[in-house]
């Protein structure tokens, strides 16, 4: 059990050292909020209450089309598990629709593992060689399990250069 004045210490937040702190609590010591807000620091600490306030309340009549359509470019032969995990994570963010652009070898894996995501198959069976049209998407994620094939790298560079959408790499 650890008490810390005003802010958590950085070591509380790392796996190697958090074990030694155990459960911790912050004790305010009356620092000026102006001084706290204007003191430069490379770190930001966000509490759960702040994150929860960012979530939109959904009406019982809301529909998936109102919450964005994302594209996840992921997977290669032997690495489809990463694509599946990425798709599940994207869906947990609250996105309305998710399309996964995957190599041909991953079609059945994706459809069975994440049936709520739509699958769009690359022309190549083992890796990503091009992303195709991405204009209809609100945001794009790229990376999980892509591998190191030169054609995939070319497709990645083309996407980064041409994408005018929010992009998560």
Task: Tell me what each language-model feature is.
Residues 1-6:
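Conserved phosphate- and dinucleotide-binding cores of soluble alpha/beta proteins
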Residues 7-169:
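Small-residue (G/A/S/T)-rich helix-start motifs and N-terminal tracts that mark the onset
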């Amino acid at each position: 059990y650890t008490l810390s004045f005003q802010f958590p210490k950085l070591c509380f937040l790392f796996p190697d050292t958090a074990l030694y702190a155990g459960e911790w609590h912050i004790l305010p010591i009356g620092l000026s909020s102006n001084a706290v807000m204007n003191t430069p620091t490379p770190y930001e600490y966000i509490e759960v209450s702040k994150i929860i306030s960012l979530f939109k309340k959904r009406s019982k009549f809301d529909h998936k089309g109102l919450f964005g359509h994302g594209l996840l470019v992921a997977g290669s032969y032997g690495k489809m598990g990463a694509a599946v995990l990425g798709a599940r994570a994207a869906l947990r963010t609250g996105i309305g629709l998710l399309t996964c652009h995957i190599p041909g070898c991953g079609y059945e894996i994706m459809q069975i593992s994440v049936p709520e995501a739509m699958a769009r198959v690359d022309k190549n069976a083992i890796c990503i060689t091009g992303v195709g049209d991405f204009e209809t998407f609100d945001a794009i994620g790229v990376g999980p399990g892509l591998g190191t094939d030169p054609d995939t790298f070319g497709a990645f560079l083309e996407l980064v250069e041409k994408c005018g959408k929010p992009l998560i790499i």
